[in-house]
């Protein structure tokens, strides 16, 4: 017997770019950017088992192999040209053009091979080529020493849609004083790239990207931002921003029945069926940042709310929604009497738990199947069979949240060390110092009586993120 099992997993991207900057005159500068990139995700899990039996004068060979292949290859060719014209002391006009040619090759394949038979199933095989064209113009206008205005217009075209998308943008900044300002921005944006990932996945190794299908409208969003900034004499930045974002025609992947627990069945989600999804988000962001001196760092707090709407679920909070998030990052240069060039750092992250759909019970489902009779076997009697399966009962989508998230990391860095003529920094980092258990997901099982085989209540255990690590 010979067995072979393995994974072939080339994954990564590379980009080649060329930039040409041309000073046409003291007031006009042109910049052209040409880029070619390839993103590649090619996962192949394979198993091959060869057996040989020798019995007296006969030899029997048996061969069984299977392959599971996921492939996502994206090739992008981009050309951008931008011209900046300093018209006068108060107006700076920018205009440009962009062209993106993208080839998508997305597939999923199952291959089963025996000694004399090969079975191939390809539930996903999508190849398409898209082209995005855009032209834009923008004017930065210094209305006065205190008021600055920026207005622009972008026109976008997607080759699979027979229309031109109009994207206006406006912004204004009012300098209350030399170190204090108020700003506002509004803009409309379209997107022609989508992901074919299960929206309920909390962890994924890769995003499967694809171009917007011809029969789907482009995703559109309107962003509005209001902000206030103050830069203190002690080189500390204080910033407050509030925002509102409205989304239409987001595409959410339709899910298979992920809560079924039928033995011997594979629950799958199609890669090319989507719900037309609406959404909106609003929030408040606070930032205090110090970038100079022996003690540096920043403190950021975010209050955010996000809601999605799909036909089967109504309005709900998506998996990535976190209402409260606090981040504290500090760096301290220790005095020379402790040690030369020694720096300590710490990072604290705390947030509300992410939403999830809770399982509230379990039920049995029965299905009826009729075999035989005149339609299938003329003259044979009909047979009626019943099949039972188990299914979890769930509450409303994302109606509960995981426990709050907390993590403290600390580290020490020794800078400007020397090895022969080379300089380097050495560091040690401790992750999750308090070993706080942060749930990534929950694992469920049905309690079973081993003596009778009867199935009882549903049990739950957390699948945690990073533990204490050095």
Protein language model features and the residues they cover:
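Short loop/turn motifs that connect adjacent beta-strands in outer-membrane beta-barrel proteins
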Residues: 25-29, 86-90, 143-146, 179, ...
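C-terminal beta-signal and adjacent terminal beta-strands/loops
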Residues: 347-381, 385-388, 402-407, 414-470
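Gram-negative outer-membrane beta-barrel transporters
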Residues: 144, 244-246, 264-355
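Face-selective signature of the C-terminal outer-membrane beta-barrel domain
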Residues: 10-161, 236-239, 298
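Structural signature of Gram-negative outer-membrane beta-barrels, strongest in the C-terminal barrel
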Residues: 74-76, 86-92, 98, 124-247, ...
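Surface-exposed extracellular loop regions of Gram-negative outer-membrane beta-barrel proteins
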Residues: 2, 40, 108-111, 159, ...
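Transmembrane beta-barrel strands of outer-membrane/channel proteins
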Residues: 32-38, 95-101, 151-155, 184-188, ...
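Outer membrane beta-barrel strand-and-loop segments of large Gram-negative receptors
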Residues: 76-82, 123-128, 134, 217, ...
């Amino acid at each position: 017997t010979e067995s072979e099992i393995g994974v072939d997993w080339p994954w990564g991207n590379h980009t080649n770019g060329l930039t040409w900057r041309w000073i046409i005159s003291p007031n006009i500068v042109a910049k052209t950017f040409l880029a070619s990139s390839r993103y590649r995700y090619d996962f192949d899990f394979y198993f091959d088992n060869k057996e040989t039996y020798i019995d007296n004068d006969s030899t029997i060979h048996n061969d069984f192999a299977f392959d599971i292949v996921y492939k996502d290859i994206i090739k992008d060719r981009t050309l951008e040209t931008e011209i900046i014209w300093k018209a006068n002391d108060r107006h700076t006009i920018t205009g440009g053009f962009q062209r993106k040619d993208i080839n998508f090759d997305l597939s999923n394949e199952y291959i089963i091979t025996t000694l004399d038979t090969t079975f191939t199933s390809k539930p996903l095989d999508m190849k398409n080529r898209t082209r995005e064209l855009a032209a834009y113009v923008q004017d930065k206008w210094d209305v006065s020493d205190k008021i600055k205005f920026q207005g622009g217009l972008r026109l976008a075209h997607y080759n699979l849609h027979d229309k031109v998308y109009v994207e206006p943008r406006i912004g204004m900044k009012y300098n209350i004083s030399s170190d204090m300002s108020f700003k506002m921005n509004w803009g409309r944006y379209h997107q022609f790239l989508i992901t074919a990932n299960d929206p309920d996945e909390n962890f994924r190794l890769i995003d499967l990207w694809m171009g917007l299908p011809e029969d789907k409208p482009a995703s559109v969003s309107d962003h509005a931002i209001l902000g206030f900034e103050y830069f203190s004499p002690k080189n500390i930045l204080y910033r407050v921003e509030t925002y509102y974002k409205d989304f239409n025609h987001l595409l959410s992947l339709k899910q298979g029945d992920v809560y079924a627990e039928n033995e011997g069945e594979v629950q799958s989600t199609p890669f090319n069926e989507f719900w037309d999804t609406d959404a909106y988000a609003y929030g408040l962001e606070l930032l205090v940042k110090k970038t100079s001196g022996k003690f540096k760092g920043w403190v950021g707090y975010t209050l955010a709310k996000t809601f999605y709407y799909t036909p089967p679920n109504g309005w709900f909070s998506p998996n990535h929604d976190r209402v409260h998030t606090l981040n504290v990052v500090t760096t301290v240069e220790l005095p020379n009497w402790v040690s030369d060039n020694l720096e300590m750092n710490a990072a604290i992250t705390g947030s509300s738990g992410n939403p999830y759909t809770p399982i509230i019970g379990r039920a049995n489902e029965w299905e009826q199947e009729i075999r035989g009779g005149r339609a299938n076997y003329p003259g044979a009697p009909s047979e009626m069979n019943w099949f039972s399966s188990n299914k979890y009962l769930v509450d409303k989508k994302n109606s509960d949240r995981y426990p709050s998230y907390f993590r403290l990391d600390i580290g020490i860095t020794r800078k400007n060390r020397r090895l022969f003529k080379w300089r380097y920094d050495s560091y040690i980092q401790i992750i999750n110092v308090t070993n706080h258990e942060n749930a990534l997901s929950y694992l469920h099982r049905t309690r079973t009586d081993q003596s009778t085989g009867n199935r009882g209540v549903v049990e739950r255990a957390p699948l945690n993120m990073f533990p204490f690590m050095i």
